[in-house]
């Protein structure tokens, strides 16, 4: 199963900005690795929450569309809420 998500570059950093994103149904994330600089991004929570239910989400290469440019990544780390079925943050590594 191929996964493809639209992402926005995140400019506001910090705890307050991340909380505002989560309250609006979005997830802060980061893309790093390779020769490019790390990029902070914003993703839709519901899309990712549904996709992460599939086992292949963790092993396959995922395509992120960041500012019109496609980036191939793999999930490096995921942080989940302690008792709610919510994602808190995701780290992606360039494939």
Curated annotation (Swiss-Prot):
Keyword rRNA-binding: yes
GO cellular component terms listed in the entry, alphabetical order: cytosolic large ribosomal subunit
GO molecular function, one term: structural constituent of ribosome
Database matches in InterPro entries: Rbsml_bL25/Gln-tRNA_synth_N (IPR020056), Ribosomal_bL25/Gln-tRNA_synth (IPR011035), Ribosomal_bL25_short (IPR020055), Ribosomal_L25_dom (IPR029751), Ribosomal_uL5_bac-type (IPR020930)
Pfam families: Ribosomal_L25p
Stretch forming the signal peptide: none
Any one GO BP annotation for this protein: translation
Keyword RNA-binding appears in the UniProt entry: yes
Keywords annotated in UniProt: Ribonucleoprotein, Ribosomal protein, RNA-binding, rRNA-binding
Coiled coil: none
Subunit architecture: Part of the 50S ribosomal subunit; part of the 5S rRNA/L5/L18/L25 subcomplex. Contacts the 5S rRNA. Binds to the 5S rRNA independently of L5 and L18.
Family affiliation: Belongs to the bacterial ribosomal protein bL25 family.
Function in brief: This is one of the proteins that binds to the 5S RNA in the ribosome where it forms part of the central protuberance.
NCBIfam families: PRK05943.1
UniProt-recorded name of the protein: Large ribosomal subunit protein bL25
Name of the gene encoding the protein in the UniProt record: rplY
